[in-house]
Amino acid sequence: MNGFSTEEDSREGPPAAPAAAPGYGQSCCLIADGERCVRPAGNASFSKRVQKSISQKKLKLDIDKSVRHLYICDFHKNFIQSVRNKRKRKASDDGGDSPEHDADIPEVDLFQLQVNTLRRYKRHYKLQTRPGFNKAQLAETVSRHFRNIPVNEKETLAYFIYMVKSNRSRLDQKSEGSKQLE
């Protein structure tokens, strides 16, 4: 059990899969269109939240009750995420089903940010929310606001290129200003 195999271990067969390693020798736990998925399971799990979103979207995915794990393959993980993002874009105020609309606004996944960062964003822009929002609600509110911020792209890119060419940033300017005061 110290990581080295002994002669006795080799007679007993291969070691059992560690319980903590997700997807080790396991296949996806989902049944798609009545057939069990045979792809290898990744580290994404089929949580209650994912299960709820799938049932709301009326997808033909179900969990196989005979398996003892909840890990899904990368294909189904990406499929579920893409369906979630497509539905969000289609539900936007201006129609959203034109191909131009999808190319104009890149999808930014703010769910990856920490709760403190989302709260700081909310405080900076003085967004009105109820107290006690959880991370998902906060990320949804912030992403709704983030998509509606007007940006002068030409000016922003010109400023960025200028700063890159001059090897300076606003932080450099602030530190130089404090040196001049001394």
From Swiss-Prot:
Family matches, as Pfam families: SAP30_Sin3_bdg, zf-SAP30
Acidic residues bias locations: 1-10
Atypical zinc-finger residues: 28-76
Disulfide bonds: 28-29, 37-73
Keyword tags: Acetylation, Disulfide bond, DNA-binding, Isopeptide bond, Lipid-binding, Metal-binding, Nucleus, Phosphoprotein, Repressor, Transcription, Transcription regulation, Ubl conjugation, Zinc, Zinc-finger
Modified residues (N-acetylmethionine): 1
Residue ranges, annotated region (Important for DNA and phosphoinositide binding): 87-89
Protein's recorded name: Histone deacetylase complex subunit SAP30L
